[in-house]
Structure formats: C-alpha cells, structure tokens
Amino acid sequence: MKKILSVCVCALLAFTLSAQENPEKKPKKKTAQVPANRANDHFVVQLGYTNWSGIPDSITKSGLSKSINAYFMLDYPFKTNPKLSIGIGLGIGSDHITFTKTYVGIKDLTPTFQFTNQSDTNHFKKTKLATSYLEAPIELRFTSDPSTGKGFKAALGVKVGTLINAHTRNTKFQNKAGTSINEFVMKESSKRFFNKTRISATARFGIGHISLYGAYQFTALLKDGSGPEVRPYSIGISLSGL
C-alpha cells in the first residue's frame, strides 16, 4: 500500500513539474488588417449654401450666399477596425454673403460694423462680403467599405481657422428708382471688425465620393461690441477622393 501511495505521489509531482515547464500558451489577439489600397479621401472640396444665425431684421440679404472650402487631409485608420479612422488636414475655407441695396461699412472708422439700408437713395445693387480662413479640420471617420471607398461614409469633427482676408465687392451703382448710374466695381478690405479665430462643428454623410456636409460656427463672426452677434452656418455638397 505504501509503495502504491509513493508511486502516485511521484507521478503527481512529475505531472506538476511538467505543467510548470510547459505553460499553456494563450493565442495572440488578432488585429484587423488595414487594406493596402484603402481609400483615404486625401482631398476634400465643398460647395454649399451659407447663412448667418442671429441676423437682425434690419440687415437685408439677397441672392444665393455660398461657402467654398478645399482641404488636404491625412487619414489614420484604427488598427483594431479599419472602417474607423481619424482625418487631419489643412486648407482654405471661405464664406460669401450677398446683400441688396445695403451699404456694408467694412472700412468705416465707426466703433461698430454698419449695415445700412440705402434703398431710398443711390446705392449698389449688390454687395458681397467675403471672409477667408486658413483652417485645420479634424474628423472621426467611418466607411463601410474601406477597400474601395464606394460604400456609406460618415464623418464628425471640428475645424479651427484663422482669418486671412475679409473684403466687400460692390457692383451696379443705381439710383433709388433702380436706374443704372455706373457699372463700376468697388472693392474694400479690412479685418478690423472680425474675430481672428473661428471654431466650427462639421459633419459629412454620403455614398462613395459624394456627401452632404454641414458646418456651424461656434464663435461669433464679429468681435464683441462690433456688431450683431451672428454665427455662420452652411450646408452643401462635399466631394472627396484619393
């Protein structure tokens, strides 16, 4: 009996030592493979309608105000899920707001930015106020088909910009009856009334290389106390590729 017990104990010790010397290897966690030909949407061009939130009734807008943006983006896919990525870029964003029979005093020495209705006197029929920014967008992106880039795509993000130009363009000088006086074009430029930095929320949703986009500016267009507290927003078509 003692011999049998001794043999069992020795066998148990031998098995224990063997298990310690050859621990069970855990399988490595597999990571998703990022396709070598992944569509990265390096170039993004946007054309849309733009407007101001908070615009007072005293300011008369007309026509189709537009937004034009162009960015070069770098795309960093998640190793654990190539359908998700972070896009970071640099480019130019511009807004073009149109007014009718309104004097836009961009170069005036007044303490506030003046928008004056001149329909009852000589006036320019059309005035365009254009602002341009050097912008750095960042997006959280999703694509349903990262290999071809032809499936559903979505992106949410923010963009930070610094003002590089603000100017007005006035055309078709008329009298109050609408009769043309002169066809000359008057341009004026000044950044005095404008906030130098803008921060905007952005979104894109679409199929393949064509998407709908929207943007809303968190920061006010004009400096505090320089005019109405308006915030630009835009919606339009976004083209992306490469």
Model-inferred region functions:
Residues 1-37:
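Cleavable N-terminal export/targeting peptides
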Residues 28-41, 77-84, 145-152, 167:
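Short loop/turn motifs that connect adjacent beta-strands in outer-membrane beta-barrel proteins
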Residues 39-41, 62-70, 130-136, 150, ...:
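Residues that define the transmembrane beta-barrel architecture of outer-membrane proteins
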Residues 50-71, 222-224:
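Surface-exposed strand-loop-strand hairpins of Gram-negative outer-membrane beta-barrel proteins
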Residues 56-63, 98-131, 163-175, 181-200:
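Extracellular/periplasm-exposed beta-strand and loop segments of Gram-negative cell-envelope proteins
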Residues 185-242:
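Predominantly the C-terminal beta-signal and adjacent terminal strand-loop region
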